[in-house]
Amino acid sequence: MAELYYQGHGSFRITSDGGRVMYVDPFMGDGYEPEADLVLITDEHYDHNDLTKITAAVGCKVFRGRDMTDGKHYGSGEKDGFRFRAVPAYNRNHKKSECVGFIVEVDGVKIYAAGDTSTTDYMPLLAGENIDYALLPTDGIFNMDAEEASACAAVIKARHSIPIHTKPDTPFDGTVAARFHAPGKLVVRPGEKIKL
């Protein structure tokens, strides 16, 4: 069974049942000791792309949002049992051509890492994806706030929705997370793990 470890802010790690390790948006917190087989970076803002945190395993691959889209077309890939594809993520602070979300599948579980985004035209299509875990930003400064994220969660219809990116340069703000409402809501605090 795959496992998610939340480092804080927008940073998290997923370890497959076979022990392969993927990091998304490395920046905040600890828990970077396991060598990375795969790293996904949703955008190039400093709080999403600190590769100095990562020790790369032999053959590690890094996929950056800017390389996964031109704003119209979106790439996909597969590495060590992780299947992933980029999807639109954008708002007034993030251009369509520079930022993406990722849908990741591993061990029969589907995860949506929204990246820095607000509501997108693509989100209604996510309802048909049967997403198990949606990780949604909620800070309301560089992306949508908790109320808008709650509305997006209702559209996406993931089995579980997790509020992240709750406050700039802060691992986690429980007050913001408490304002996020969604069926199957999970609150995961920095340093906590969940079985997927």
Each model region followed by its residue ranges:
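A short helix->loop->beta-strand "cap" motif at the edges of active sites that frequently abuts
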Residues: 20, 56-62, 156-160, 183
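Core dinuclear metal-dependent hydrolase active-site scaffold
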Residues: 1-34, 38, 65-128, 144, ...
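Metallo-beta-lactamase
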Residues: 36-47
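Cap/insert and terminal regions of metallo-dependent hydrolase folds
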Residues: 120-196
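Short, conserved loop/helix-junction motifs that constitute active-site signature segments
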Residues: 32-34, 52-59, 127-130, 152-157
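Divalent metal-coordination and catalytic microenvironments
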Residues: 14, 43, 84, 116, ...
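Short internal beta-strands
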Residues: 41, 59-67, 160-165
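Metal-dependent catalytic neighborhoods of phosphoester/phosphodiester hydrolases
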Residues: 50-59, 171-179
